[in-house]
Amino acid sequence: PQITGKTASGQKWDISSWGDTFGNRSERYLAAVAYLDGARPSMVFARGYYTGPEGETGGRTVIATYDLVDGKLVKKWRFDTMDYNNQYIGQGNHSMSVADVDYDGCDELIYGSLAINNDGKPMYSTGLGHGDAQHVSDLDTSRPGLEVYSCHEETQAKYSFEMRDARTGEILVGGEQMGSDNGRGTSDDIDPRYPGCEGWSAAGILTAADGTVISTKYTMPANFLCYWDGDLGREVQDNIYISKWNPEKEKVETIFTASGCTSVNGTKANPSLTADLFGDWREEVMYPLKDGSALRIYTTTTPTSYKIPTLMHDIQYRMHVAYQNDC
């Protein structure tokens, strides 16, 4: 069908009490696309991820999913923390990840410290509460299945950052509570000396997938990632810079600067978009110009000897590109 940008259908929000109304904490919305039935994409909309750790009143999270049938939105299911107890309140992050964590052919939702099955039923909650960032992938290649790496704001949580089994919620690696808001966290393969993906956060600790501490000397940017040069490791993206981890010097070194551009999303300093747009598996980066007059897309000029199908053919990657466009 022709894409016009016109609204196809809509639903009114049911406005009610959402606990803590400090700032806009009760008005936090998320969206994603997920293959909940394993066959066709569904729309996922959510509200609420702050307040209400176990034993505290207030706070609410609702996730509603819809299919577009004959041009109309048809509700698939709705998850509401008011139907359960406090263990599911206040567990969300600034985005929800989409992945088939139990290998049943259908996507599940990783909602911060909470996981929701493709049928709308809760799978688990770690109870570690809200955090800004999370990454879901095969982070530890020595064990089956997917893992989640997440940082946490709650100082009463046991860990400031952790890596867990994405299906069961079992904590595999836990970072000591630092006593303050650990607001950034990132995980990917940046150090070729260690198998799997490394993890780092605002706590200033770089760990291997098995929990081995690689470095505590340097607080590395933990905002975003990018495949940019020709090797199979990931690069670190922060603000208008792309950098590469130097294991010998234990710091990142800038390899690209988007001159004349600016980042978006405040202190998160993101690009407008990072994705494999042109299909050679390295990723393009999109930034607004400083004067806001246009968007500029950059692509790498570095040759590579690796031939990999375009990343957009990986369904989890494609769904993640979609949900990265909300916060």
Segment roles from a protein language model:
Residues 1-327:
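Beta-propeller-forming repeat regions
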